[in-house]
């Protein structure tokens, strides 16, 4: 289990426990004030507070880690939620309703949540705004503090943007997944790419990586990414490889 490479500050809190559940949930919180990531870390460093989060985001867009991902933070007033969730505290530019955050903090939040989902195998971020779906991560894998305690957290500003957050994170995950797609045989390719790749294979331009072949005797280890395939097709269509 890894931690986010996006952090620029680490101040590990003693207020945490061993995680016993796989990470499959995201819980976004608000700091209820415009605290820096250093100030938030100092608060969580106090054992008497018995509170922490995995990450924190300041109004300047910087990201800190307070509890490593392999540990459960004490953040959401619910140990079962925190055992499966990555918790993120976001600074507020106004310490009252609707508890807004800066553009820089919101942009950093999108980056961080995308990274967390990608590294932990969360294929899609799901939000219905339905408390009854807590724990049903195939239907909803975002939760909020207000569902577990009498609090406004994460504030209406962020709460009302959970659907937007999910949509943008999913858009980014789709792009990342497509970039990671690899094709080893001509049969696996999308139809629009098969003529070009077949031509290049038959011409000996593409030979595969290790000598494996498919039923037609063509390479079965082409190891072509989506981007590589698109580039080859573009080159073919403008005549670089001849007719």
Task: State each model region's role.
Residues 1-82, 153, 157:
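N-terminal catalytic cores of peptidoglycan-degrading enzymes
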Residues 2-9, 18-20, 94-180:
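Basic/polar, cationic surfaces and motifs that engage anionic cell-wall
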Residues 32, 81-96, 114, 147:
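Cell-envelope and extracellular/periplasmic
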Residues 50-52, 104, 108-115, 164, ...:
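Extracytoplasmic/secreted proteins, especially bacterial periplasmic and envelope-associated proteins
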Residues 176-243:
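Short, solvent-exposed alpha-helical surface patches in non-cytosolic proteins
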């Amino acid at each position: 289990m890894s931690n986010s490479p996006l952090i620029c500050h680490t101040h590990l809190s003693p207020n945490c426990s061993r995680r016993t559940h796989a990470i499959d949930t995201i819980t976004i919180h608000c700091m209820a004030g415009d605290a820096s990531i250093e100030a938030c870390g100092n608060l969580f460093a106090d054992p008497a507070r018995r509170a922490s989060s995995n990450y924190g985001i300041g109004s300047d867009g910087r990201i800190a880690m307070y509890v490593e991902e392999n540990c459960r933070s004490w953040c959401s007033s619910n140990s079962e939620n925190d055992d499966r969730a990555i918790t993120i505290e976001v600074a507020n530019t106004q310490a009252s309703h609707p508890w807004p955050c800066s553009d820089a903090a919101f942009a950093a939040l999108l980056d961080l949540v995308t990274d967390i989902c990608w590294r932990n195998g969360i294929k899609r971020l799901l939000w219905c705004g339905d408390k009854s779906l807590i724990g049903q991560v195939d239907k909803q894998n975002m939760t909020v503090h207000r569902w577990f305690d009498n609090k406004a957290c994460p504030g209406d500003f962020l709460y009302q943007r959970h659907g937007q957050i999910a949509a943008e994170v999913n858009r980014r995950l789709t792009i990342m997944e497509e970039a990671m797609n690899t094709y080893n045989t001509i049969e696996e390719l999308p139809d629009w790419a098969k003529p070009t790749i077949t031509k290049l294979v038959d011409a000996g331009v593409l030979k595969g990586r290790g000598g494996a072949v498919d039923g037609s005797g063509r390479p079965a280890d082409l190891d072509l990414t989506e981007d590589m395939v698109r580039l080859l097709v573009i080159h073919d269509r403008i005549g670089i490889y001849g007719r």
